[in-house]
A protein has these predicted regions:
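Hydrophobic, helix-forming membrane-interacting segments
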Residues: 1-61
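Short beta-strand micro-motifs in enzyme catalytic cores
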Residues: 110-112, 122, 163, 230-235
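Short amphipathic alpha-helix that is part of the acyltransferase structural core
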Residues: 63-98, 106-135
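Conserved acyl-donor/pantetheine-binding loop and adjacent beta-alpha core of acyl/acetyltransferases
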Residues: 125-169
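Terminal substrate-recognition subdomain of acyl/acetyltransferases
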Residues: 12, 59, 63-65, 170-171, ...
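Conserved acyl-CoA
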Residues: 155-160, 184-201
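Conserved acetyl-CoA-binding loop-helix of GNAT-fold acetyltransferases
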Residues: 169-172, 177-193
Length: 255
């Protein structure tokens, strides 16, 4: 299709070049009838060029990948997410892709991602964890690299119990920052928990980069601890976090 589009481009270009020269030589004969014919040639050529250009744009638009919210994630997508994380920190701070995919298979709301074509370019991990995991995160003794499915809390179970939320990762490729993508993904993530939002009391982040810490500050988090693996632990009320997400307009410091 790309070659066909290129051939179309060449044909349009040739027509755009040849038609004026043809009209020029017709006019050069000096006859009024030929001048009228030249005008018709130019007008027809212009219409053809415009139509061909519109058709070419349509063809290219149909074939070009578009930025979209990924409907169904595969394990390959989680491998792409891990590769994005690896650009910023080491493997000892990255959840193995197969494990993160297990989270998603059991609780699809754990991961919201944006893709360009089939390539993940941004994602958010937000979910409740069990009380002991949350407390270990808060006191800095737990590295979520080791977090498994067993450590996640089922938001539909124990309807009277509070939920302890963990914003595990927020990452957007640099080329896609400044588009409001991070805020949009966060908004979609918190929408999933609206039915149980009254049970969501606190939310925590574990930041291994300065950019991550700055992101947490901008979204209302306050530092509570430095972890045993030298990351910065931030926390706030969940309702306050939701308000920051909904109220954010200029916050495009993506981590």
């Amino acid at each position: 299709m790309f070659w066909q589009a290129n051939k179309s481009s060449i044909m349009v270009l040739l027509l755009g070049v040849v038609a004026p020269f043809t009209a020029y030589f017709i006019i050069g004969s000096g006859k009024n009838g030929n001048i009228e014919l030249a005008k018709q040639v130019l007008a027809t050529s212009l219409c053809v060029v415009l139509f061909a250009a519109a058709l070419l744009s349509f063809i290219l638009a149909k074939k070009s990948p578009t930025l979209r919210i990924a409907d169904e994630l595969t394990e390959q997508h989680f491998e792409q997410m891990a590769a994005l994380e690896a650009q910023y920190y080491g493997e000892d701070n990255i959840t193995p892709p197969a494990e993160a995919y297990r989270w998603y298979q059991r609780y699809p709301a754990t991961t919201i991602a944006a893709a360009m074509g089939e390539q993940i370019v941004a994602f958010v991990n937000l979910f409740p964890v069990k009380a002991d995991i949350y407390e270990a995160l808060r006191n800095g003794s737990f590295n979520d690299h080791t977090l498994t499915l067993d450590g996640l809390a089922d938001p539909q179970a124990a309807p009277e119990e509070p939920l302890h939320m963990f914003l595990c990762c927020v990452l957007t490729e640099p080329a896609y920052r400044g588009l409001g993508l991070t805020r949009h993904l966060l908004s979609l993530a918190i929408e999933h928990y609206e039915p149980v939002q009254h049970r969501c009391q606190r939310i925590i982040t574990d930041n291994v980069t300065p950019e991550g810490a700055e992101f947490s500050r901008r979204y209302g988090f306050e530092q509570v601890q430095t972890s045993s693996h030298d990351s910065l632990i931030f926390e706030q009320d969940y309702a306050s976090f939701v308000n920051h997400v909904h109220g954010t307009r200029q916050m495009e410091v993506d981590s």
